[in-house]
């Protein structure tokens, strides 16, 4: 988490005994950071890809004792879905993988980092060659019903590579009042960023948007949304 990033800001606002949902946890680095920043939070970390999940399970066991790792995707409804897994880019795989867009974003990011074209070509060669995997999908509200039926949700972190709207559309109306903060990476294609922020605002969360300097020129943005204090 960068010093100025929204993940760090969200972590700093956690309270002991908060529930944290880490949706798209990958190998668990964010989950570890949340637990380290605020000991006492209960982290529910969710990751659908089997190889990434095995790393997540081990990391949670070693570094997040007050947490649980679940092997599932999260979307608008319960069921199964086909994901495109990128063995060479395990942080970029998705239910809505788009090889052309993913290649463009990676190339732009590396250019912003100062790499020359030869280095970029070497790094990106076949990086988004994918394979199909079938995974179980649940919803935020189903996760809460099964694993955290009560308590305040201090943070919902979302990093799901173009499935951001699916995740928040899977939150039942009765659960929104429990959620204090949402932080998400959002891919702004098809007006997704505006729709995502509008949905959060419709449930009482004030939204902010930023784009990291290294991601300028890509479709990737960060969203920070929090419920205003009641005093």
For each feature predicted by the language model, list its residue ranges.
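Phosphate/nucleotide-binding beta-alpha loop and adjacent structural elements of enzyme active sites
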Residues: 1-231
